[in-house]
């Protein structure tokens, strides 16, 4: 889906979804508000936008049209779902497969300030998005205000391990312990 790792910009003015809306649903209208801010981010040299909460733009919610996950040390951290974050099947699949292969997963709020702090400490190892079309989209850098932060590749990438496991299940090359595949017959 994406031919390269993404560079993303953390949005601190515009919002994709607001409390009381339908941001939790996979609805086309939820992404119309993304066009203009994404165009602005692209003009700055970024591929996608990291969406933050509409109240104070501090809690990270999603990236582009995907769920977002962070590897902090050896833990996979992803934002809690809410009325502004889609509790989608791709997100659920990534969480389950990560647990299946022995990765510790934590669902909780993560703020922009925490992300930058973890980056500065060297404990932010990976960022990736997950969605239906992309499965997993690795993120190689993120921008916030005037700063840009580069994420170095890691040899034991959680994103690669999770994607490989999901694709093998999809292609019937691995067991499907969760009953996700359905045989289609004529």
Summary of predicted features, one role per range:
Residues 1-186:
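Helix-start/capping segments and mature chain N-termini
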